[in-house]
């Protein structure tokens, strides 16, 4: 059982209780619903959070991904509705809110959901220029992080990234992914990343924490099948660049010592440390 699965199973009882009280307050705004009905709905929401996860651990399916997506959307909506009901409660302590104001506040959540989903499925390229004296020529790097391939964003996100990288092939020389290529919500199968195989620039990847949840060996195998260069506490030289991939370390996964990292750096090149999280730099 993966770390993510254990974490979700531990949280499900609390999640069900949270759902019950959230739904109870929301329905009270409209006159109320019998508690038995709310208990059943809350339990079903809790089951939807954990049951598809067991199937997705073994083999990702369309049905499993659908329920995981619904769960993810509802979990986000629940947090937004919580903010809504707290705001409504506070305002009602001072004034009596007209019903139409309550309806507007609640309607903001699905509107925001549609807007955020639209933005989350778009790939936007932002540019930043860094200047160094010891570069022979301009090098454009595509930097990505937290792709989170999984049940919610499955092969379509890989296809999107592949198409975007192909668009950038004439202007960019290398792509770097700094962790969480997978999110651990579904098993990564050997050919899941093969959509990136046809990209005509090197793709470098260093694991983040989520990449370990369903088995880092599965993520590495899928990367290798797609021609992705995996840097697991290792370095890769490209033109005037020396890229060192510092793998995310936790539990029994040790962090390389400062001396080990320094020995992998090249004073004659531009050194880039590819690391998932911005801490431990001291």
Q: Which positions does each model-derived feature cover?
A:
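Non-catalytic terminal accessory segments
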Residues: 1-123
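Context-gated lysine
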Residues: 6, 24, 59, 99, ...
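A cytosolic-side transmembrane-helix exit/cap motif
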Residues: 58-61, 123-127, 217, 222
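Soluble catalytic domains of enzymes that build or remodel membrane lipids, polysaccharides, and related
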Residues: 131-282
């Amino acid at each position: 059982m993966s770390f993510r699965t254990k974490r979700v199973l531990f949280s499900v009882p609390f999640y069900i209780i949270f759902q019950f009280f959230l739904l109870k307050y929301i329905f009270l705004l409209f006159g109320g619903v019998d508690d038995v009905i709310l208990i059943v709905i809350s339990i079903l929401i809790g089951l939807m959070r954990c049951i598809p996860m067991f199937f997705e651990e073994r083999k990702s399916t369309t049905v499993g991904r659908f329920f995981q997506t619904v769960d993810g959307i509802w979990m986000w909506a629940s947090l937004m509705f919580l903010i809504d009901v707290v705001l409504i409660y506070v305002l009602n302590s001072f004034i009596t809110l007209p019903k139409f104001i309550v309806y507007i506040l609640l309607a903001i959540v699905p509107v925001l959901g549609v807007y955020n989903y639209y933005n989350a499925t778009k790939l936007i390229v932002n540019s930043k220029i860094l200047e160094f004296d010891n570069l022979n020529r301009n090098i454009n790097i595509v930097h990505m992080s937290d792709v989170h391939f999984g049940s919610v964003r499955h092969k379509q996100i890989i296809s999107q990234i592949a198409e975007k990288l192909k668009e950038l092939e004439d202007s960019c020389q290398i792509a770097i992914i700094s962790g969480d290529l997978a999110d651990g919500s579904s098993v990564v199968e050997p050919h899941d990343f093969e959509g990136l195989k046809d990209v005509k620039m090197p793709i470098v990847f260093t694991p983040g924490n989520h990449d370990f949840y369903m088995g880092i060996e599965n993520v590495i195998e899928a990367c290798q099948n797609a021609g992705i260069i995996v840097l697991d506490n290792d370095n890769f030289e490209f033109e005037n660049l020396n890229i060192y991939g510092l793998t995310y370390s936790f539990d029994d996964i040790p962090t390389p010592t400062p001396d080990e990292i320094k020995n992998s750096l090249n004073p004659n090149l531009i050194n880039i440390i590819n690391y998932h999280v911005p801490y431990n730099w001291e």
